Amino acid sequence: MIKITKENIIPYLKEHLPDFDDSLPVNISMVGEGTEEEDGDGYVNYIYRVQTPKESLVLKQGTDISRVSQQEIATYRNRLEYNSMRIFYAITPEYVPYLKFQDRENNVFVMEDVSDLKVVRFQLNKNKMFPELGRQCGEFMAKTEFCTSEYYLSREKYRGLQKHFENTELRRIMEDQMFLDCFGCDVDYSLGNNFADFASQFSKDSRYRTELYKLRRKFMSHADGLIHADLHTSNILASRDEMKVIDMEFAFMGPFGYDLGYLVGNLISQYCAACFKRFPSEQNRKQFKAYLLATIKSLIETYMKTFTLCWERSVKERYRGQQGLLQSILQEVMVDMPGYASMVNWFRSVSDIPYPDFDVIENKDDKRNATVLSLMIDWGIMFGRYKYQSADDLIETIIGIEEEFRKSL
């Protein structure tokens, strides 16, 4: 296997892209060598940005050793990421980078560079707003999940996706890390012993553990449609009008509602941070918090609406007129989604893994308060989800817990 470097990347591209023009100045940079805010990727794979006056490309190579941690990792992930992007682009070309070519022998693919857009997580950390983010992400999830489900595809194509995207090794990371490791992870003591004791007490609660096991069972056994499976705000790039989703190597046939909950959880963490981090004024804080809640509402409602439209227009003949089945699917999403949101925030909040959403808060007491609020919301939505009928019910829980928490300060 050829290992791509800054020294050999130009002849490599010329070999695989005959129209690649290096007669003009070419700028080559490795993604991950810059700041997180600039790149948001490059921890596992070797990713290069190649810019000429005519075009800008990104080359991604998956080796058997992770770039940063130097741990062994399956190289097939590069092939699965390319194929998932190809499928998602066919369904929602407006939300996925355009692919140029794939080199399976060397675990490489090349796509358009979308770095003119910004990594959403770090823009939210700076209180930047993306008015269309909820709608765009809701459309992306609903369309791609429906169009890769058995409700749309032939049985043969659906089974083919299940087999192709088995993704055993990377799925194991999520199955263990997100659903199990929070019970044995090193609690973050940097926020004080009282916080560590509080977080540990929550983590040891058998009721919460039972809920995580129930969600893990669905994550492992429900092959509803092709999901991204790592759709956090660092894997979304956006401007005021555009949005692109990247980094799809965890993709597999998983449950409806997982990606939705994963992203909602990231937005909840931003909300908790916004309750305590610095703003130019309290009016700015109020506006940003309102924006985050509106984005959560738009995300969920757009998903439900778009999935329904896809169903009404394109569901297979045998399911036409079965509104009860559609409503059952959407209700299950409404119940599962807050659980997955709780799960992802819980793990990131109690562990000592850096969490940029909270790390941006400079004052230690404010950071601790934001993290505690997040844990309390995680607890509340995990057990409150069974009665939720709409996004408004979830948002009501978030606001209610914040109000009660402030009374204790």
Report residues per predicted region:
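Short, flexible/disordered intra-domain loops and linkers
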Residues: 66-76, 275-289, 361-367
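ATP/Mg2+ or Mg2+-diphosphate-binding catalytic cores
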Residues: 323-409
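A glycine-centered beta->alpha junction motif in the catalytic cores
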Residues: 62-67, 113-127, 146, 269, ...
